[in-house]
Amino acid sequence: MEFVERYVNKYASADYHSCADESVTHQFKSLLTQCQRYNNKVKCNHLAKMVKKIKMANEILALLKMKVIAENKAEQWRNEKVQFREDLEKFGESLIVAASTSEEHISELEELREKVELLAKQNDLLEEKLKDCEERCRLREQEVISLESKAGYELNVPVSVCPVTEQEIKDGEQGIRPQTLPSPTLFSPQSECARQRINNTYVPTDNNIHSNSALKIQEVISLTQILGKFDTNLSPISLYNKLEAVVKQYNLGNKDACALLRAWLPYQLAAELRPPVGKHIGTLSNINENWGSTSERLRELQRILGGRDIRGTNALENARYRKGDDPMLFCTDYLSLYKVVFNCPDMLPDEPNFLYSMANKCNVDYNTRTALRYATSYNNFINTLRDWSQESFEFQRHISVAYKKKQSRRFPRKCYSCGKYGHIARFCRTSANQHDTYPIHSIQRQEGDAQENLNDYLLDHSPPSETETVVSSDNIDTGSNSAGDQKESQNEPKREFHTPPCKTGKEGTTAPPFIPWVNIPLWLYSSWSHIAMLMLMDNIAQFAQGVPNTNMPVF
């Protein structure tokens, strides 16, 4: 070993460095890399034998360095192993100690649990006893009140009104106490005489039955149902009279009357009540004098209802959301009206009572109204209402489009005047224009032909009793029976039919009539109807005999 050290000290030229914090493999790799680097730097001017010695010395030095690192690491691992073994021994000892102490703690915990259960049972028994004591105290108070009221009644009522029976006298001599009925509750039926007897005796104040005991929640709910809905449109005086009637009927004290008023009012108005109606004055709340009297209750009602805007109240009552309205605009207007009417400017729009009230003002279907009533927020309410509006609009739009498509079908019939589809000849504009431009002389010629045919038919079918000769529609002489008169009448010029002027859009223009025989005299109409009746009777008779009619006129 000494020879190796001398050899290394003589020929080695490397200087190795390593980090003790790194792992052994990393340190060994670093030493080998440094050794190779130093061997590559050996100058070539040395002899080959000298170069080999230097490289070998560097490699031996690297191996010695690795040996030292390995020994140090082995020593470190050995120390850590010893330390771990000591720690394990200490941990095992602590586990043994903890296991021994845990049994003691478990026993202590079980004892504490048993004590807690025992105390809970004792607490339940004490609560039951306390409830029994309270019930007994309440019954005794009612008995005392009934006895005092009865004693006061016996002192004030004369003997003639309530005579004492013989049985009561015997009971008094034997020392037997008379049986007293239990005190009537708040909602037990009382006769008018008994109620008047209680009101006129015992205490001079106006609330004597429930002056020491507060109303229960069920009793308050029953009284509010008796009062009915709080109508904001009524005057404060009428609302006050309704409240005081219930207060006097059930003999409520100031504290109970104020509690009933707070429960009857909407929560926005109840929050505006000031002491001593909204809250008691003084330190004790069980004393009736610390609560508001009848005049103070009336003053508070007038204050919270008198400052409200009647127009705003009417607008809030008449507010409605209908199909086609803007949901955002309706909700914004209703929110502002609600805050003004109920005097709550700091109210959040997500208030459930406000959303429920606004949902009742919407004219929507049942499912949508239910969703609006139980909306979680103001924005959710608006979105639900907007979705319903869009769905109804799309449905209406679909119906209108289908209706338009149905109405867009053309008229299937054809006009025989112009040959076009969509109308009939009666309403044809082309034929109307043709009638307007029809020549007058052709109409006169057609009228003349029709008149001649009519005259010939009347001459052939005139009745035998009449000797008249129809010559012309305007030149008829009823008294002429001779042939000369007939010739003269035939030689007279025929009367021309002049069309009356018809005002159109322009002055100076005339339109011929569509019926050429409008100017036929009335007697000719009557004769024609008589002839038509005779022909009809003749045709009916021939039809009954089975003979065809050959005398039908042909025009």
Curated annotation (Swiss-Prot):
<dbReference type="GO" id="GO:0003677">
    <property type="term" value="F:DNA binding"/>
</dbReference>
<keyword id="KW-0238">DNA-binding</keyword>
<dbReference type="InterPro" id="IPR036875">
    <property type="entry name" value="Znf_CCHC_sf"/>
</dbReference>
<keyword id="KW-0863">Zinc-finger</keyword>
<feature type="region of interest" description="Disordered">
    <location>
        <begin position="455"/>
        <end position="508"/>
    </location>
</feature>
<dbReference type="InterPro" id="IPR001878">
    <property type="entry name" value="Znf_CCHC"/>
</dbReference>
<dbReference type="GO" id="GO:0008270">
    <property type="term" value="F:zinc ion binding"/>
</dbReference>
<feature type="zinc finger region" description="CCHC-type">
    <location>
        <begin position="413"/>
        <end position="430"/>
    </location>
</feature>
<keyword id="KW-0479">Metal-binding</keyword>
<feature type="compositionally biased region" description="Basic and acidic residues">
    <location>
        <begin position="485"/>
        <end position="498"/>
    </location>
</feature>
<dbReference type="Pfam" id="PF00098">
    <property type="entry name" value="zf-CCHC"/>
</dbReference>
<keyword id="KW-0862">Zinc</keyword>
<protein>
    <recommendedName>
        <fullName>Posterior protein</fullName>
    </recommendedName>
</protein>
<feature type="compositionally biased region" description="Polar residues">
    <location>
        <begin position="464"/>
        <end position="484"/>
    </location>
</feature>
<comment type="function">
    <text>This protein is expressed exclusively in posterior mesoderm and ectoderm of early embryos suggesting a possible role in organization of anteroposterior axis.</text>
</comment>
<keyword id="KW-0217">Developmental protein</keyword>
